[in-house]
């Protein structure tokens, strides 16, 4: 079992979740079960999958969970775009969160590469 708190991808994705919760709190109430809920679930899925994967015994299993986290990360990116297009996020908010998304994505790619090379 791995200590997930030692992975930068986990720390960065955890921060992204908190940021997504903050900005979606300002979305229209009508979006609570739409974009707000979906965006929160997708963002939270990133560190949750990392945590679950880290608890698995083998590197192959961990790599699969990291890969799922990558998919959730891409989902969040589109949702950020959509939220800006709908006027729920300002351009500055979207760009700030997109920059954080990019950092998470890079760290996930690095982690996936490292875990995939483990025996």
Residue ranges and their predicted role:
Residues 1-119:
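Short, C-terminally biased terminal segments at protein or domain edges
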